[in-house]
Curated annotation (Swiss-Prot):
HAMAP family: tRNA_metthiotr_MiaB. This is tRNA-2-methylthio-N(6)-dimethylallyladenosine synthase. SMART domains: Elp3 (SM00729). Coiled coil: none annotated. GO terms for cellular component: cytosol. Catalyzes the methylthiolation of N6-(dimethylallyl)adenosine (i(6)A), leading to the formation of 2-methylthio-N6-(dimethylallyl)adenosine (ms(2)i(6)A) at position 37 in tRNAs that read codons beginning with uridine. Residues 148-380 form the Radical SAM core domain. Its EC number is 2.8.4.3. Signal peptide: none annotated. Residues 383-443 form the TRAM domain. NCBIfam families: miaB-methiolase, MiaB/RimO family radical SAM methylthiotransferase.
Length: 443
């Protein structure tokens, strides 16, 4: 859809602001590459940009209102504003409303259509407002430019969309059905990332372990086969993946954790709740016991694996006793890190129309208790790492002279001082643990 408005000069500088998940970070990087390929330059820190792309997230409540707040803050002191594009999942879900409520927005583009961003920006500069929220994911990836320079850690989207339809979640409606990118495309993009400087690649998907394809010999493979193929790249030192669903943890993927040295001992495997009635109401298609049994198999394959999870407190109808089941599950697992949220009703999802919504004050109290338990376990995991010697991938400089920051194999933030360069793999002895990071020294 398009409409006419007064024309403005073609933008020469841009800024992409991404919110939310790691896939949004990946999408934001690809949008920046698209714009740079058209001859535009990224605006420096503190500089005004001719074009601002708000790459939005729709998972949490009030996401749409946050977009309008961000749009308002883009108006400059002299009353002018940059050309504004709204991208991402809020654009997908609320695109027409954004165009109606925010005349300063010239472009609305969904997460499966952002390959069209350059031509939509050109139309906007010529006075045409436009909205594009189709879902041609395959066409999107085919149209994106080749990867060039990369940081030491890089994201690679291998799968998009979700077919699980958890009752609280908007992803199937904003990202669409599950699609897997072709094996050959992923191997090519990974090689380009490594050639550009990446030493660690995180494979991304809304349901990443549902990825399926055929290898270069036409044989059907899953995510474990893709990881094995990427591990053959000599200069790629580490492989991670996120986010996974328990029902798609195959025997092959579990085995890969015990067999592939480059597949890091870290797994983000959300459970969301520890009570079976709540899990059924969420349409999670697993029980607390089946989740725990799965973790036993994973730990048997890789005993030192660090586990991460997601939790929702206050799902409609959740009782005090049912919440206590979640706390018991947390105690039994001992997560290395995890993320917890209050239930947030999303328009259009089945859970939004369920009865017996939990009062906010009750959700607040449950979240506080759950987060305290998760923080306790994260600190305990970090303290148990003290005395270990491990490889750390150096990602950036620290706040202090001579200090470096990087990640351990277990995704812990590690800071140390000494001779190093960004992108180096260095051996570090872990000497002191805090709740969110570990200090070390070069071994």
């Amino acid at each position: 859809m398009s409409s006419s408005a007064p024309s403005s000069a073609s933008p020469k500088t841009f800024r992409v602001k991404s919110f939310g998940c790691q896939m949004n970070v990946y999408d934001g990087e690809r949008m920046a590459e698209l714009l740079a390929a058209q001859g535009m330059s990224a605006a420096g820190d503190g500089d005004d940009a001719d074009l601002v792309v708000l790459n939005t997230c729709h998972i949490r409540e009030k996401a749409t209102e946050k977009v309008y707040s961000d749009i308002g803050r883009l108006r400059r002191a002299d009353g002018s504003a940059p050309l504004i594009a709204v991208a991402g999942c809020v654009a997908q879900a609320e695109g027409e409303e954004i165009m109606a409520r925010a005349p300063s927005v010239k472009v609305v583009v969904g997460p499966q259509s952002y390959h069209r961003l350059p031509e939509m920006v050109a139309d906007a500069a010529a006075g045409k407002r436009s909205t594009e929220t189709d879902m041609p994911a395959e066409a999107k990836f085919a149209a994106l430019p080749k990867r060039r320079k990369s940081a030491p850690t890089a994201f690679l989207t291998v799968q998009e969309g979700c077919d699980k339809f958890c009752t609280y979640c908007v992803v199937p409606y904003t990202r669409g059905a599950e699609i897997s990118r072709p094996f050959s495309d992923l191997v090519e993009e990974a090689k380009l990332l490594v050639a550009g400087g990446a030493r660690e690649i995180t494979l991304l998907g809304q349901n990443v372990n549902a990825w399926a394809g055929e290898d270069d010999k036409g044989r059907p493979i899953g995510l474990d086969g893709l990881a094995r193929a990427l591990a053959a790249e000599p200069d790629l030192k580490r492989i991670r993946y996120t986010t996974s669903h328990p029902n798609d943890m195959t025997d092959g993927l579990i085995a890969a954790h015990g067999e592939l040295e480059k597949l890091m001992p870290f797994l983000h495997l959300p459970v969301q709740a520890g009570n079976d009635r709540v899990l059924k109401a969420m349409n999670r298609s697993h029980t607390a016991d089946s989740y725990m049994a799965l973790l036993e198999r994973i730990r048997a394959a890789r005993p030192d694996i660090a586990l991460s999870g997601d939790f929702i407190v206050g799902f409609p109808g959740e009782t005090d006793a049912e919440f206590e089941d979640t706390l018991r599950l947390v105690d039994a697992v001992g997560y290395a890190q995890a993320f917890s949220f209050k239930y947030s009703a999303r328009p259009g999802t089945p859970a939004a129309t369920m009865e017996n919504h939990v009062p906010v004050a009750v959700m607040d109290e449950r979240l506080q208790r759950l987060q305290a338990a998760l923080n306790r376990d994260q600190l305990a995991f970090n303290k148990a790492s003290v005395g270990k010697t491990c490889e750390v991938l150096v990602e950036r400089r620290g706040k202090h002279p001579g200090q470096w920051l990087g990640k351990s194999p277990w995704l812990q933030s590690v800071h140390f001082s000494g001779e190093a360069e960004i992108g180096d793999m260095v051996t570090v002895e872990l000497i002191e643990a805090g709740p969110n990071s570990i200090s070390g020294r070069l071994a």
